[in-house]
Amino acid sequence: MKKILILALTVIIASACSSSDDSGDVNTSEFEEITTILPQGKWFISRLIDGNSDKTSEFESFDFTFNTDGTVKAQNDLFTENGTWNYDNSSSDDEELVLQFGNTTPFDEINDDWEIVSISNSQIELSDISGGDGDLELLTFTKL
């Protein structure tokens, strides 16, 4: 009887202990605040580097307005380009800002799933490894 009682207690204690760890979630949300920061005001591209090429000047006259419905508008005095944006944390190793504009130059340069590097209320830093040539691309939005 004593052996059965000890065995039963051992089973109860063992089943109460769990090896699962909820802190090891595959998807992180470190940068989820991007969904509330981007729609607050207008932004401009303060840096766009594609490998060894600085393409920042191609966007110097454009202001970007990110809307809560996932649309984005890039606008200057003469031209407006509409696109979409979304935050994606479905990858197990990074969080991304996905930007999609038409294939109009120069906006085809920023159509990508950008890895979020850092976020503040005034600056968003992104990076990507180019699928074509493996070059590092850097994109920074700064709040106006």
What are the roles of these predicted feature ranges?
Residues 13-16:
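C-terminal motif of bacterial Sec signal peptides marking the signal peptidase cleavage site
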Residues 18-86, 90-144:
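Lipid interaction determinants
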Residues 6-8:
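Sec-dependent N-terminal signal peptides
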Residues 1-4:
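Positively charged n-region of N-terminal signal peptides that target proteins for export
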